[in-house]
Amino acid sequence: MSMKTILVPMESHDAMQSALETALLLGRRCDCYIEGFALRWTINEFMVGDAMGGVPLETYREDNAEEAKKAKQIFETFMQQHDVPPATETTESLSFGWLDNASEGESFIGSYGRVFDVIVMKRRDAHSGPMHDRAIESGLFESGRPILLSPPSPPRQIATNVLIAWNCSTEQARAIAL
């Protein structure tokens, strides 16, 4: 099986550079289509307020939409700076695309990631919280696809030495088959 599609869940901060570099390095090596989408955290409406005050739900939604725009801008700017062309219907070589209408919540990675060969995410760092961990777990356990966690600084080469951690679960069997 050859890798032809890469999914990159995007957040709107500079720590994403390493994930983008890693995805591009793999994309160039395998001549892949790289797709990004804004990883947006969901908030339940019953959790919006507390005894000391609250966060207006509309303000939260506006902030979430603004973060999604920033994530898209980071992704598209990076791809354009590295001369990666946007995908067309006939493109069969290295190209990129953006999913505008991604659902909120970390579980989207698990369901949407099933149609991709690999999911590239940044490793946990100071910007990460428990939601980021759940997003990684969703991608790994629900998509059944391999997750490539990018190191804090981008690698110079990729796929020369590979370590696979496997706990013998059925969820990971398909990821290992790659």
Describe each PLM feature range.
Residues 12, 95-100, 125-128:
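Short, flexible loop segments at the rims of nucleotide/cofactor-binding pockets, characterized by
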Residues 35-37, 97-101, 148:
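General small-molecule cofactor/ligand-binding pocket signal
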